[in-house]
Amino acid sequence: MHPGWLSNAYLVADRPGGTGVFVDSGAPLEPLLRSVEERELTVTHLLVTHGHGDHTAGNELLRRRFGLETVERPRDPFQTGGLTIEVLPTPGHSNDSLSFLVNGNVCFSGDVLFAGSVGGSSSSYADLRRSIMEVLLTLPPETRLLPGHTDETSVGREWQQNPFVRVWRGLDPEGEERCSVGGRGARLVLWARDYDGGFKALVRFDDDGDQVVGGSRVERQL
């Protein structure tokens, strides 16, 4: 994990001496490179969850070193070694956001869904909500979720405990507090902890629907 960005980079392999893939490259790569050598892996692909710099910083280094095939657009499921990889379009945080389901039981969710939080709706709130509720959280509850930042979680845990999901499911009430974001009036539907220890907010603008934004952008009217 990157000490500043808190972003993750992953190495997934089928077995020692077998085949592996990288997922994102925004964290320090030395531990992953060391694992490739120690486990004598043949790495074939670089899976890119989205194009933001805190997830792509090491892409060129990895491509040059290993001659990797890069997966950064939707495509049919494919197999490399003993790994079967499904590419799930999950836009909302960014238009190009992808999640990757490996061997049917581990999903790399990028910046769409975190442990206890969700990504900012930088490109489309409707797409973000749909990607979470109709794609990621329809996977089996035991599916491991490895997000783009900080801690691992699971589909079942986020379905039951994620505060954004609970509001979307109608399990918890929406807030009524007034606030503003960038000078625009809004209602603060939800104020919740984010992956970095700060806050994230679901706001309903008076003039333009819902958005998920970083808490630092919200002026609360307490």
Which residues fall in each region the model found?
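Conserved beta-strand hairpin/beta-sheet module of binuclear metal-dependent hydrolase folds
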Residues: M1-R39, S99-G110, G116
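Core dinuclear metal-dependent hydrolase active-site scaffold
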Residues: L11, P77-V102, C107
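Divalent metal-coordination and catalytic microenvironments
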Residues: V12, D24, H50, L62, ...
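Hydrophobic "anchor" residues on beta-strands that sit immediately upstream
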Residues: G20, L46, T84, V106-C107, ...
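Active-site metal-binding motif and surrounding structural segment of the metallo-beta-lactamase
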Residues: L29-E72
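Histidine-centered catalytic micro-motifs
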Residues: L46-T56, L88-S97, L145-E152
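A short acidic, helix-capping loop that chelates divalent metal ions and anchors anionic groups
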Residues: A115-S122
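Accessory terminal helices/loops
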Residues: R130-R144, T150-L222
